[in-house]
Amino acid sequence: MAGRGKVGKGYGKVGAKRHTKKSLKETIMGITKPAIRRLARRGGVKRISSLIYEETRNVLRSFLENVIRDSVTYTEHAKRKTVTALDVVYALKRQGRTLYGFGG
């Protein structure tokens, strides 16, 4: 058993787990009800209708799609493969939502 650590008998190699792509429905449900509630509390909301949660997820998804699309456009124009913080800042500025504190 030398050289195998705590693995055991060593029947073949086990590689690293690969990331599997979750479906969009699964991913958007990752924005939990308590997380939406915390955001609403920060905005000063006292009571929340049960219909709000799904609508909030849809609005957030469309907002992020727009920001990410613009960020990737800036990245591709600069002939890079990595989206930087400045790409996101410029994408938000383009949509009229200026973000301070990240350069630019």
Swiss-Prot record:
Stored Pfam families: CENP-T_C
Keywords: Chromosome, DNA-binding, Nucleosome core, Nucleus
Localization per Swiss-Prot or TrEMBL: Nucleus; Chromosome
Any one GO molecular function term: structural constituent of chromatin
Keyword Flavoprotein: no
Function as written in the Swiss-Prot or TrEMBL entry: Core component of nucleosome. Nucleosomes wrap and compact DNA into chromatin, limiting DNA accessibility to the cellular machineries which require DNA as a template. Histones thereby play a central role in transcription regulation, DNA repair, DNA replication and chromosomal stability. DNA accessibility is regulated via a complex set of post-translational modifications of histones, also called histone code, and nucleosome remodeling.
Family per similarity comment: Belongs to the histone H4 family.
Name of this chain's protein: Histone H4
Annotated source species: Sterkiella nova (Ciliate)
